[in-house]
Amino acid sequence: MNALAATNRNFKLAARLLGLDSKLEKSLLIPFREIKVECTIPKDDGTLASFVGFRVQHDNARGPMKGGIRYHPEVDPDEVNALAQLMTWKTAVAKIPYGGAKGGIGCDPSKLSISELERLTRVFTQKIHDLIGIHTDVPAPDMGTGPQTMAWILDEYSKFHGYSPAVVTGKPIDLGGSLGRDAATGRGVMFGTEALLNEHGKTISGQRFVIQGFGNVGSWAAKLISEKGGKIVAVSDITGAIKNKDGIDIPALLKHTKEHRGVKGFDGADPIDPNSILVEDCDILVPAALGGVINRENANEIKAKFIIEAANHPTDPDADEILSKKGVVILPDIYANSGGVTVSYFEWVQNIQGFMWEEEKVNDELKTYMTRSFKDLKEMCKTHSCDLRMGAFTLGVNRVAQATILRGWGA
């Protein structure tokens, strides 16, 4: 089942639990706007190259639409649509005043020079500048993009609309980026894990973790979890996978990955088959890489008691069912990885106010939001006698549905 089908399925289950009117259900599912543009740029060798860019603006009932822009060879309209919809529910679960959006360009950023990436970003911005904006749609980084990409978008957008730092988040600090934004998703994963374990009478200290993915989210989650006494016993990234049953020295691994661009070759752990990472023995599994990695083929072999979905849509519905029967507790993506968009909201607020916060305030506010959201999610679980994923979906869908009705759009 692809990401869009799985997301639609979860939405429909939540709508049924909430007893939503069929017309309202249909209107909440259909995106507000889908944008597809061609971006032709001159390459460094003088030839022309053409790329297709997408932006799906899913819902704006609760505020400006919000979501990342990814650069990847396999950017797929269905996946972008699914991720835009997930952002709508995620921002509602986090109780921040946004709707959902997502964008992307079908390209391989590793095969483009910095100047080619800049030209591509500027052309894409020129094509969509009148459809995004501070109070309309606020992009952010995603796979294959980062603070520099956001700086180019900000600059190009500002040529048309005047200097507008709040039009994108995840910017460099020198252009109005927020302190704490780089660590935000990983820190949110840690706060969410704490909240879940507390519910089960446990703490992070002494728990054995396996983390799939050691990019921004996975590496920050590993660092913060290890600082809380968690034992990271296995890690993987695009270069390979490593294991140390006594616990990996995370500061040493972070130093190694910075120098060698990956976990491969780290001498403080043994190399293992990357395909086995999800089924390694542990207490808590943190998928922090791609979607759809936990499926019916491997779900029965998973040994973890808890799964923290740091990635978007890492568990497909078939695996969900298998794991539920095994008693595995899954902290769903639309809550678990919402730290990033929450601190993006803080960045947007700081830009609009023209007043920047200290990092301690950013982190304290993030903890407050993550703790409150978990309590709200658990209340929905009790109300509807459902698991955490349906608790999160009913919480998010209900908030968007109520805003839609209040604005007079649900008739």
Swiss-Prot record:
Enzyme Commission numbers on file: 1.4.1.3
InterPro entries per record: Aminoacid_DH-like_N_sf (IPR046346), Glu/Leu/Phe/Val/Trp_DH (IPR006095), Glu/Leu/Phe/Val/Trp_DH_C (IPR006096), Glu/Leu/Phe/Val/Trp_DH_dimer (IPR006097), Glu/Leu/Phe/Val_DH_AS (IPR033524), Glu_DH (IPR014362), NAD(P)-bd_dom_sf (IPR036291), NAD_bind_Glu_DH (IPR033922)
Biological process, per Gene Ontology: amino acid metabolic process; response to absence of light
SMART domains (UniProt xref): ELFV_dehydrog
GO cellular component: mitochondrion; plastid
One of the Pfam families matching this protein, by short name: ELFV_dehydrog
Key word Manganese present: no
Alphabetized UniProt keyword annotations: NAD, Oxidoreductase
Catalysed reaction, written as an equation: L-glutamate + NAD(+) + H2O = 2-oxoglutarate + NH4(+) + NADH + H(+); L-glutamate + NADP(+) + H2O = 2-oxoglutarate + NH4(+) + NADPH + H(+)
Residue numbers annotated as active site: 102
PROSITE patterns: GLFV_DEHYDROGENASE
Domain of life: Eukaryota
GO terms assigned for molecular function: ATP binding; cobalt ion binding; copper ion binding; glutamate dehydrogenase (NAD+) activity; glutamate dehydrogenase (NADP+) activity; glutamate dehydrogenase [NAD(P)+] activity; zinc ion binding
Signal sequence, renumbered to the chain: none
Transmembrane feature ranges: none
Protein family membership: Belongs to the Glu/Leu/Phe/Val dehydrogenases family.
Protein name: Glutamate dehydrogenase 1
Organism: Arabidopsis thaliana (Mouse-ear cress)
